[in-house]
């Protein structure tokens, strides 16, 4: 079973991805992250996604949460995305990054970091539900790949 940590757990897309993870085969929730000081840190994710208590508490401690992860699903603003990308690369944890666009410097960081881990870029397609399922599908796929940078074109047919 693949264990996924989701960042931005207190946001709409984070909650949607978490809800879908509970209904997915072959992948499960290992943890949920939010930025330091977010009001939902310490909250059970089930309370946010309407499932009751799940035992998974939102944290702002990447190092502790990452110990449980086979993959990180990260789709919060770029500055934070790239922080988690660098941290994932240091620990060789694959990462799925949801994005609506990266500038030149951000793309350089992605390319450099993906040399040390596996990274897949998932563009936000405008439909949150489609994006959430694409992110989960990408997370299940990326853990079996060699180090490098990938995009959704690479997992077509999976």
Language-model region placement:
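Short acidic/histidine-rich motifs immediately flanking catalytic phosphotransfer sites
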Residues: 66-73, 90-95
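Alpha-helical hinge/cap motifs
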Residues: 11-14, 77, 92
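Rossmann-fold NAD(P)-binding glycine/threonine-rich loop
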Residues: 79-91, 97-120
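Short, charged/polar "capping" segments at the starts of alpha-helices
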Residues: 37-43, 103-106
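Active-site-lining helix/loop region of Rossmann-like oxidoreductase modules
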Residues: 2-35, 53, 67, 115-116, ...
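Short, aromatic/basic amphipathic alpha-helical patches
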Residues: 44-47, 109-111
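Fold-independent oxyanion-binding glycine-rich loops
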Residues: 9, 35-36, 61-62, 75-76, ...
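Glycine-rich, highly charged phosphate/nucleotide-binding loops
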Residues: 47-64, 73-81
């Amino acid at each position: 079973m693949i264990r996924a940590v989701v960042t931005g757990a207190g946001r709409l897309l984070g909650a949607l991805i978490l809800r879908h993870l509970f209904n997915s085969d072959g992948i499960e929730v290992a943890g949920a992250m939010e930025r330091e000081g977010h009001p939902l840190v310490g909250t059970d994710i089930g309370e946010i996604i309407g499932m009751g208590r799940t035992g998974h508490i939102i944290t702002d401690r990447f190092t502790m949460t990452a110990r449980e992860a086979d993959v990180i699903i990260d789709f919060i603003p770029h500055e934070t995305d790239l922080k988690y990308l660098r941290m994932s690369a240091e620990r060789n944890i694959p990462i799925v990054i949801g994005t609506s666009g990266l500038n030149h410097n951000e793309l350089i960081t992605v390319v450099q970091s993906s040399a040390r881990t596996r990274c897949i870029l998932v563009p936000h397609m405008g439909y949150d539900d489609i994006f959430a399922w694409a992110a989960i599908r990408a997370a299940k796929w990326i853990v079996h790949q060699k180090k490098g940078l990938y995009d959704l074109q690479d997992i077509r047919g999976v």
